[in-house]
């Protein structure tokens, strides 16, 4: 196969150097292997939570599902590196649906997938009971909520929503293979091209984005990547300026780096490792405000929680995002929910409008199990941590009006 394919390639493959790591073992942090828990215990926990929703007034249907993965990966290369790694991850989602003369509305839990074991389903790790208790009233309020008036609003975006905006507008945009055109015929390229490294004003001076393989319970946390590179942490955006990319050993030289930062991944032995996202996160402001103070600082705005649908162009530049909950803010106080909300911007305008970054108390690690990339397609789990943040006068669309209904 290699000999047959060789005439099609015009670039010589050369890997940047990496120290040898012989016979290394790494295991992610978790308490309870989900595969050690009986199916009946799993079903009972989900049934207990979903039945509480069904018992509430205004909830006509409830669904609950959980996914859990134990990944065991062994790597060896001809330079002498050999690693054995194991990591565990969990994702649980519970939905409440209301059906009536209004049509239907839904709302789901805000719990994020993460590198936990079955302990993730305990209330001392994530307060499931409290969220389930609040969900029916929030759903009823959403059903009765007015449709948003389109225009420009200050947006207070919760990390349960902002993680996805980071993923689409920063995570994918700063994949170096995408920036140099390797993904052009599948999922697009990037506006953040290599000629802009060190000069592109990605966002406001409050914006500090890092890539890492170290975050506790991160879905992209590993000891070594799939080219035998040890985990690292590095700056991607510093004080609002693009300063780094996600690299593997094959493409690092394109930005004059003599070492990869450990972003190679293959989702199975049948696939070649390609550059994939590490944990890509927005740093909180160490002295930043808590959530109540952020709400109090807004005269006219919307507080957005939870992710739903999104759209972004093939250069990771023009986008729009919706969410699960949209709370009106008037004169520093929450003033009921809205619906049919989407926010729309370009990547640099949006991040350039970030005027407040929340403190550590607002920080949440979000993410997804199912980031796709490559041909043949590969799936990777990814995490994005961030605090709540306030964005100045962002364009808000009414999704029903935009659909012509």
Please give the residue ranges for each predicted region.
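Dual-mode signal for accessory low-complexity, basic/Gly-rich regions
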Residues: 173, 184-405
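Active-site bordering "gate/hinge" segments
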Residues: 1-232, 238-241, 331-333, 371-373, ...
């Amino acid at each position: 196969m290699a000999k047959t394919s060789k005439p099609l390639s015009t670039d010589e493959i050369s890997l940047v150097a990496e120290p040898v790591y012989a016979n290394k073992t790494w295991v992610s942090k978790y308490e309870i292997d989900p595969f050690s828990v009986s199916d009946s215990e799993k079903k009972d926990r989900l049934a207990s939570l979903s039945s509480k929703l069904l018992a509430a007034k205004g909830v006509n249907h409830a669904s609950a599902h959980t996914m859990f993965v134990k990944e065991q990966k062994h790597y060896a290369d001809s330079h002498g590196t050999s690693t054995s790694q194991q990591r565990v991850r969990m994702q649980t989602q519970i939905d409440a649906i209301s059906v009536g003369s209004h049509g239907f509305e839904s709302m789901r839990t805000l719990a994020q997938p993460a590198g936990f074991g079955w302990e993730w389903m305990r209330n001392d790790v994530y307060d499931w009971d409290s969220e389930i208790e609040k969900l029916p009233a929030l759903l009823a309020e959403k059903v009765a909520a007015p449709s948003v008036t389109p225009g420009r609003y200050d947006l207070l975006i919760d990390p349960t929503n902002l993680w996805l905006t980071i993923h689409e507008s920063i995570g994918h945009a700063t994949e170096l293979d995408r920036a140099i055109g390797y993904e052009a015929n599948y999922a697009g390229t990037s506006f953040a091209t290599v000629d802009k490294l060190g000069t592109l004003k990605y966002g406001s001076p409050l914006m500090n984005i890092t890539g890492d393989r170290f975050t506790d319970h991160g879905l992209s946390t590993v000891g070594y990547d799939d080219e035998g590179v040890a985990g690292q942490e590095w700056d991607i955006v510093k004080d609002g300026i693009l300063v780094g990319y996600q690299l593997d050993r094959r493409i690092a030289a394109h930005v004059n780096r003599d070492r990869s930062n450990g972003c190679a991944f293959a989702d199975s032995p049948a696939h070649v490792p390609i550059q994939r996202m590490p944990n890509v996160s927005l740093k909180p402001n160490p002295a930043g405000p808590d959530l109540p103070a952020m709400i109090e600082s807004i005269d006219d705005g919307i507080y957005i929680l939870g992710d739903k649908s999104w759209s972004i162009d093939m250069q990771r530049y023009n986008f729009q995002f919706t969410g699960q909950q949209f709370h009106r803010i008037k004169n520093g106080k929450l003033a009921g929910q809205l619906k049919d909300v989407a926010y729309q911007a370009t990547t640099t305008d949006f991040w350039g409008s970030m005027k407040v970054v929340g403190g550590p108390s607002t920080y949440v690690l979000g993410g997804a199990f199912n980031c796709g990339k490559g041909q043949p397609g590969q799936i990777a789990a990814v995490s994005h941590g961030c605090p709540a943040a306030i964005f100045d006068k962002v364009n808000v669309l009414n999704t029903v009006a935009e659909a012509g209904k």
